Each structure stands twice: as C-alpha cells, then as structure tokens.
Amino acid sequence: MSASTEKKRRQAARETGTDRKQQAAERLAAEKAKSRFKWTLGTVLVVLLIVAILFLNSNVLFKSTTALTIGDTSYSPAEVNYRYASQFYNWANTYGSYAAMFGLDTSKGLAGLANQEYPDGGTWADFFKEEAVTAMIQTKAITDYAKAEGIELSAEEEADIEAEFAELDAIAQQQGYASVANLLAMNYGTGVNEDVAFEAGRESVLASKAVSAYIDTLEYSAEELEEKYQSYNGDNDYFDVVYYYVAAELVEAEDGSKAANEETLAAARVTAEEILAAYEALGVTEDEEGNEVAVEGLDVEQRLNDAIAQCGVEGTAIRTAKVTGSSLGAYQEWAKAERSEGDATVVDNSNGNGCYVVAFISRDDNHYPLAQVRHILVMAEADAEGVYTDEAKAAALARAEEIYAEWQNGEATEESFAALAEQYSEDGGSNTNGGLYDNVMKGQMVEEFDEFCFAGHESGDTGIVYGEAMGGYAGYHVMYYVGEGQLASDYIAENDLINTASQEWLDSLVEGYEAEKGFFFKLVG
C-alpha cells in the first residue's frame, strides 16, 4: 500500500471516528469526565452526610422543631425536656429514699428512667413525660386565664426571677461546667439553655400568681367552716387511746396457710373480756356505807396494765397519742362516739385474728387557736460521728443568748426580731421571712418549741428553748410570740374547701385544652 493511500485511509478513519489513536484519546477523555463526575457526586454526598451528622448532633433539632402543641402554642423538644426533668426532680425530692417503694431508683438519674419499668406499664420515662404534658396543659390554661384577666408579673417579681437565674453562673463555675448552658443541658436535657429555663420559670411564677389571685376571691363564713369540719365526723380529730391486742391462736389449714378459727377467736375474746372486767373493777371501790363509787384520778394506761397483769397475761398496753380518728383502725367508730376518760371496750380486729381491749383517754377536736411565732435557730455542731456533745450544745446556747441580748439591747420590737432572724437563723424554712411560722398546730414542732407556742403567752413574749429532732438537728430557738391565729378546725376546713374549689376551677380551665405530640416528641428524654 502506497504512502498516499495509507494517508487517505487514516484521514477517512478520523472522519468516521474509527482511528485507533483518536478512539483511545476519546476513551481517555470519557474516563476522565466520568471520574470527575464521580468525584463531584461523592464530594457532595460526603458534605451532605457531614452536614446531617452535625445537624443531628447539634441543638438545632431540639430548639427549632415542634415536639408538642397545646392550643396556639408550640413547644420544642428542649422546652418539653425542661418540664420532663423538672417533674422527675420534684418527684424525687418529694419522696426521697421512699421512691424505692414505688420501684424507682432515683440514683440512676434521668438517663436511667427509660430502663426502669413503671408498675402500671411502660417505663418511668413514659410516666414523667405524661406528667410533664399534664403540667404543661395546666400551666398553659392558667397563663391564658392570667392574660385574659390582666394578671401580670410586677417589675419586682420579674427582678426576683432574674436574680435567681443570675446565681446560676456561680453554680455552674462551682460545679465545673463551662457555662450555664452546659449545666442546664447536662441536668435537664439537650437543648435546654438559659432562655428555655428562664421562660419556663417565668411562666410558672405567673401561673402561681394567677392561682393565688383566684384563691384570694374565695371566702367562707364561720358557719360554713364549722359545718365542713363537722362533716369529717371525727376523722381529723386527734385521739389519745391505750390498747392491748389479744391475738387468737392461728390454726394451720390443709393448704398450709394459717388463720384463726371460730374456736380460737372465741378463746381470745374470753381473755379480752377478762382483762376488760379486771380493768373496770380497778375503777371502782366501796365507800363507808358499802356503795360502789368511782376511783378518781386513776391513770388510764397504768390501770389497763394492772388489769393485764392481774389476768396473768404477758405483755403491756400500747398508747397511741395524737392519732387522727381516720387512723384508729378497728375501734375508730367506738372512739369517735361520745366518750369520757377511762371508757373501755373490746373490739374484734377486722382481719378476724384477734381483738382489742381499748381504753379512751382524750380527744382533741382542733377547736383551739393556731399559734403565730417567730424564731431564730442556732444549731449545735455535730462531731464526726454525728453526735451532739454537751460542749456543742453549750456553745449553741451561748450563741443564742448573745443574739437574744442583741435584740434586747436594740429596739426590742417584732420588726427588729425579724431582721435578726433573717441575719442569724439557721432554719432554712423561715430565715427569709423573718423567722415567721404563722399557722402552727399542736404537735407540729419539736416538743419544747410546741410547749412555748401553746403555753398561754401574750403577744411580745420571748424566750429561749432547746430543740432536737431525731436524725435532724439539735440546738436552741430564740422565740418571739406574735399572737393567735384562726381556729385549727377552721384552718383545716378552709384548706379543704379551697383545695376542692381550686381543683374544680382548674378542671374548668383545662377543659378543651389538648396536647398534640409532634414527630419530634421522640427527642424528649
């Protein structure tokens, strides 16, 4: 083949696309283009994946999506998280170590709720989520009511809320958190920050103010309060009784269970009746003419114990003082009838396994005025074993006397006492309100404190009393008697009426409010 012919062939091949070099060049160009396309697409996918990961791991989903809608308000997962955690913390603080009785181990914290079964089904996480939703519905209904009624937070109330949240900076630093946001997120859930917590706190304060405003509209006459208290039929009265329980012999049945039968229960009743007869005999004697007369001044508890001993029965009577009528058990109906000191009877136990010999000592129907007092608590310092030594108590007394002297040498008024209480008192329950307890009931405080409250003092009377609570504290109270409050019976009845009316009012407010859970509710908890 001539050179010219070969040249023409190559030219024709190029024109038709069949030249091998051209084909190779075109294939290389195509591969490069394909490679560039793959690289570009891969890069886009990687970038999108990175963005998705960052998005999911950020707070955006928790702050910008909707987890719950109530009426015209939407709540983000972060906002629900705060209420969810708050429900758990409030519950844990209320029940403390008793939470274990309900099957909850609070030591595992929020993270452990999803792995603990709730007794009625589901998990404890489910329980607290529903509690949070219920609370949010109520708060939403109340704050809507507040807006409709023109109830707003005052500048002072707003400042108080801001002051409380301002303290979070120091708390966060003290506990080693980089910021308040980190503190809140770690303890309340992802996305929870200062804004979320502040708004929830503000909302709660407004709701409380609205509830208080409603309660202030409730008024009850003395007749209404007395009628309400009498409707309890002695359930809220306090009783002082002494009893001895005669247990019937338990007989084993064919299935291995043990229980009293008619014969053994009858035998127990005979013993109880013998003790009762001996008790009654100890209460009478004969006068000079041979007539039976009651023995005056007998101690009821000692009398019952003497009767038990006379009958050759082992054991002693048990005294239950300051017990409400509703807690008396099998003999409550007998005790709540008209009784005099020393009355006694035999009552079968409701379980059919024995009977009581019970004697009546006294009954308090709560028709006494509540005490209003101020105090300054100076606590003794416990040693390493938790013991309050005489030296520690003496030091506390000396400090209490110093504070008392400071008050006496000053203006010596109720106002100056209140100021010293806020300055010196170690009672966290009253040292922010001048040491005031304005509705003290009998038996509510430690013994010496209680005795001061109900010793017939006049307004302005003062003194120092010792106080000690098992497992709590030991120390001295500088006391200031303010005066008498309302009757305890009226206080009990009024609180009951207010609680009932408030619940009915709240039920009417939340009627029509529903919570709609969104897709992102799954992020809660």
Where do the model's predicted regions map?
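Peptidyl-prolyl cis-trans isomerase
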Residues: 274-332, 367, 402-448, 482-483, ...
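N-terminal targeting/tethering segments
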Residues: 59-196
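PPIase-associated folding chaperone regions across multiple families
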Residues: 15-45, 52-63, 183-277, 323-398, ...
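Sec/Tat-exported extracytoplasmic proteins
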Residues: 84, 88-91, 136, 140, ...
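N-terminal targeting leaders characterized by basic, low-complexity, disordered sequences
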Residues: 1-15
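Surface-exposed intrinsically disordered loops and tails
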Residues: 104-121, 284-300, 313-315, 325-337, ...
